Amino acid sequence: MKWLFHTLLCMASLKPQGAFNLDVDWAWVTALQPGAPAVLSSLLHQDPSNNQTCLLVARRSSNRNTAALYRCAISISPDEIACQPVEHICMPKGRYQGVTLVGNHNGVLVCIQVQARKFRSLNSELTGACSLLTPNLDLQAQAYFSDLEGFLDPGAHVDSGDYCRSKGGSTGEEKKSARRRRTVEEEDEEEDGTEIAIVLDGSGSIEPSDFQKAKNFISTMMRNFYEKCFECNFALVQYGAVIQTEFDLQESRDINASLAKVQSIVQVKEVTKTASAMQHVLDNIFIPSRGSRKKALKVMVVLTDGDIFGDPLNLTTVINSPKMQGVVRFAIGVGDAFKNNNTYRELKLIASDPKEAHTFKVTNYSALDGLLSKLQQHIVHMEGTVGDALQYQLAQTGFSAQILDKGQVLLGTVGAFNWSGGALLYSTQNGRGCFLNQTAKEDSRTVQYSYLGYSLAVLHKAHGVSYVAGAPRHKLRGAVFELRKEDREEDAFVRRIEGEQMGSYFGSVLCPVDIDMDGTTDFLLVAAPFYHIRGEEGRVYVYQVPEQDASFSLAHTLSGHPGLTNSRFGFAMAAVGDINQDKFTDVAIGAPLEGFGAGDGASYGSVYIYNGHSGGLYDSPSQQIRASSVASGLHYFGMSVSGGLDFNGDGLADITVGSRDSAVVLRSRPVVDLTVSMTFTPDALPMVFIGKMDVKLCFEVDSSGVASEPGLREMFLNFTVDVDVTKQRQRLQCEDSSGCQSCLRKWNGGSFLCEHFWLISTEELCEEDCFSNITIKVTYEFQTSGGRRDYPNPTLDHYKEPSAIFQLPYEKDCKNKVFCIAEIQLTTNISQQELVVGVTKEVTMNISLTNSGEDSYMTNMALNYPRNLQFKKIQKPVSPDVQCDDPKPVASVLVMNCKIGHPILKRSSVNVSVTWQLEESVFPNRTADITVTISNSNEKSLARETRSLQFRHAFIAVLSRPSVMYMNTSQSPSDHKEFFFNVHGENLFGAVFQLQICVPIKLQDFQIVRVKNLTKTQDHTECTQSQEPACGSDPVQHVKEWHSVVCAITSNKENVTVAAEISVGHTKQLLRDVSELPILGEISFNKSLYEGLNAENHRTKITVIFLKEEETRSLPLIIGSSIGGLLVLVVIIAILFKCGFFKRKYQQLNLESTRRAQLKADSLLQD
């Protein structure tokens, strides 16, 4: 029977592979020959009628005769792409600034930004024209938003102060009659620009300095007009002795050159031929050969300093000539000459009607600058403004766009209301729209120049749909606003996310992503393409879309290549479908300036691919596609991206990338999983192995689609087999070593590829380990022969490691020939669990290991113990053999590994005793563990025990002996005392202990002590003072309040002195009860951390004894007492005499004296 091992590939995050999983070797590039579209953006679109996908390319049109949209498809040759213009696109008259191209299952929307002049007016505007196409690219609706207010609900009020509109208004026919809206056909009838001819008086009556001021005035006027009037052209005619054209309308189109010519004009002087100069303009300026257009509005500005002089023509004749019809004339008179009625009447004759609006008079040339704003207001007056505030004139409707349901579109109006911006919710069915901008809560000063509507996106939430709009210049940092379409009194965008860096253009690109493809938006990507560190590298913020009104939460950020600056990463973004076939949406992000400046003609720009997974988007890209790897001559590659549809019909999602001059389509490569199996014959390695082991290695393709089958036929599989990879000395090896290393096999078709090879034993087969499995690792990769191929080559999954592990077991002397079941019992005990550093010398652990089951192979014991335990000795049995290595540091512990009964531990017991010395140094932790771990090569036979140790540190601290102090209260009622406490000892391990000094300050109800000062000798000693009702360990009689001093000490010695003032003058009654005052000293510490070795010396006392003397009695008392005493003495003597006391005694004494004399005489006689 064969033993078959199957393995699944391990999930892992690897470094990006260059070709996962878009095929850069085969790309469709739009042709660069004349007439091909110069790309602004590109889009993949599918026609639902035939399910065919085409490439739509938007180009910058120079005029109305060139198409703005092209449809491209694969031509007859499979590697070429052919493009045809798409009809029906609205192309108004004007200068085209850009094209917005979006699409979905409802159709395709093309919006062109147009720079033109308003109908029958000098006012210029920057607006949009949009065409909505059906899914098969037929025209569905179109609108030219030249007069945006005409498209709005007439009941919708827009407040130009706070830039928000209120909801309400009329419906039905009332709406249709609101304002007249112009069609593109009507646009053809409008005039072609504005032509302004300046007629400058250069006669001799003008001083050169004044003439220079006139030239400066003309230069300033032209600059201001160029900024306000998009299609204004100028001509300048000077008159005097001669009449000459300084520059005409055609030459003024070069703005810088024409401004330079103004300053280089030389004054011609002499006569004042004003009428002839005006006729010269009619004959030589407002003609086609000089750049004049037939339908252009024509303006003549005459600047003069007085009467006409020396002119052969009559002014009235010139004014009434047919050529003057339709020319708007402004007359500016400079100087005092116009105080004369005739001269002023002549000036008014030059001007058009009404004379008051077209005639200007100043006293001198220095005052001309004051006319600029008034003249500009008359010539290029911006209708619909409040002051200088613009409303819809520069709205650029359609700058961004989204197609909604029910014939509605959402259009960005980035330039509305002084570029505060907004959006137009427009219905193509009834031609009406609602203007949406920021909430009234926003400060009107901060919303100006926000560019709201620069980008738009639609978020699909569980409770409905909401719209988000980017405002990249909001408060200079950028912001994202959201509009929730619900039944509310007001529809307005509310700020939801703010940018973090000034100038980063945060919010300029928005990309909603439905990761799991369930129809609900999961993430919103917000780009800041100008985010700068060293240059404008760019950054993309990934926000999780909240439910209902919750806040957007930042998941993470994405960035391009860290070593490249000015890449503008995030300039374009798109969700491109499931290009790696894992059922999660992927995202493409463009960095169009990456690699810019590498060399003349070199391609630059990149696109990064970020794959989705169940939790969102991966932080790192799976592929970076550089322009140089796709085709030569690609510039700004990555300025637009789109995808998610199958372009070439292979069933896989493809993407399109726009560059400056062409669009590129890249096809996806099929992603395949390989299931690797390995079969051994025999299925286990015998104990005594002689011969060969037959091995069959098979790779099976596990792919959900058939797209990989054609490409597999041209693939090669390169695999390597490594035998016994976990051992330094191999026990088996391939018989043919070349057959196991970098084997290249062609995949000839089908889903299987199998290979046979032989394993043979080495000389070291059973020298040490004949029991543990032999591990065999197989690594593999696909290779191609290179070149372009009709079918995309498959690729392995980027997120799965291309390797497999197999185990070849040895036969075992057990019931199961492959696995032995050992039963390991482990018991331990330790000599003591509480260790005192500085006191404890040794600690011993006894270890008992018993195997009561089958054989245990390669049994190992690992001892993990703290570093302050130094290994001393080990006591081990003779049999089975125990061999231990020297301890080695691993992280914060020491590890000692021991081999127990190698190679086989039979049914037996092992008793081991390990002794450590406790290091006399500070141990930082309160506790530590000694862990014993038993392991072997068997399956499921792990044993472990842990013993916890508790550590304390020893110290010696001795307080000075008790002492006595005296206070003579009879001499002085108060005294100054200093109480000295000396601490000395040995503190090797930095133990922290507290010295508490207790000074009684209130006895009974009398305040007798006041502490004046506290001193110490060590800087690191910290002392605190407080008044407490109790102090010390034992109570003291009569004391009601204490002054407590607590000092935290870590040194070997310390002297603490407390100075106090003792006052007992007013407490005579207290002194009768109290004869002494105790001052206490006591050492305390945390007994769970430290061990004090001499507790008997941790207390002391200083006793203050009060000395008292008897008081001297007064003189009357002494005299009275003396007299009384004498009288008592006299009475006593009289009583004794009366009783014969003195008489009897005298007689007895005489008798005794006579007797002694008689005896003495007798004694002498005898001698």
From Swiss-Prot:
Chief place where the protein resides: membrane
Amino acids binding Ca(2+) 1: 514, 516, 518, 522
InterPro entries reported for this sequence: FG-GAP, Int_alpha_beta-p, Integrin_alpha, Integrin_alpha_C_CS, Integrin_alpha_Ig-like_2, Integrin_alpha_N, Integrin_dom_sf, VWF_A
CDD domains: vWA_integrins_alpha_subunit
FG-GAP repeats: 27-81, 84-142, 383-435, 438-491, 492-552, 555-619, 623-683
Membrane topology: Single-pass type I membrane protein
This protein's record includes keyword Metal-binding: yes
Residues annotated as binding Ca(2+) 2: 578, 580, 582, 586
Taxonomic superkingdom: Eukaryota
Bridged cysteine pairs (disulfide): 72-83, 130-164, 698-754, 814-820, 884-898, 998-1023, 1031-1047
BP term (GO), one: cell adhesion
Record keywords: Calcium, Cell adhesion, Cleavage on pair of basic residues, Disulfide bond, Glycoprotein, Integrin, Magnesium, Membrane, Metal-binding, Receptor, Repeat, Signal, Transmembrane, Transmembrane helix
GO molecular function terms noted in the UniProt entry: metal ion binding
Residue span of region Disordered: 163-191
Membrane-spanning segments: 1115-1137
Glycosylated position list: 51, 256, 314, 341, 364, 418, 437, 718, 773, 829, 846, 911, 925, 968, 1013, 1055, 1086
Short sequence motif GFFKR motif: positions: 1140-1144
Ranges of the Extracellular topological domain: 20-1114
Cytoplasmic side: 1138-1167
Subunit details: Heterodimer of an alpha and a beta subunit. The alpha subunit is composed of a heavy and a light chains linked by a disulfide bond. Alpha-E associates with beta-7.
Family, per entry: Belongs to the integrin alpha chain family.
Entry domain remark: The integrin I-domain (insert) is a VWFA domain. Integrins with I-domains do not undergo protease cleavage.
Job of this protein: Integrin alpha-E/beta-7 is a receptor for E-cadherin. It mediates adhesion of intra-epithelial T-lymphocytes to epithelial cell monolayers. Mice expressing a null mutation of the alpha-E subunit gene exhibit a marked reduction in the numbers of intraepithelial lymphocytes in the gut and in the development of gut-associated lymphoid aggregates, supporting a specific role for this integrin in mediating retention of lymphocytes in the intestinal wall.
Name of the protein in question: Integrin alpha-E
Source species: Mus musculus
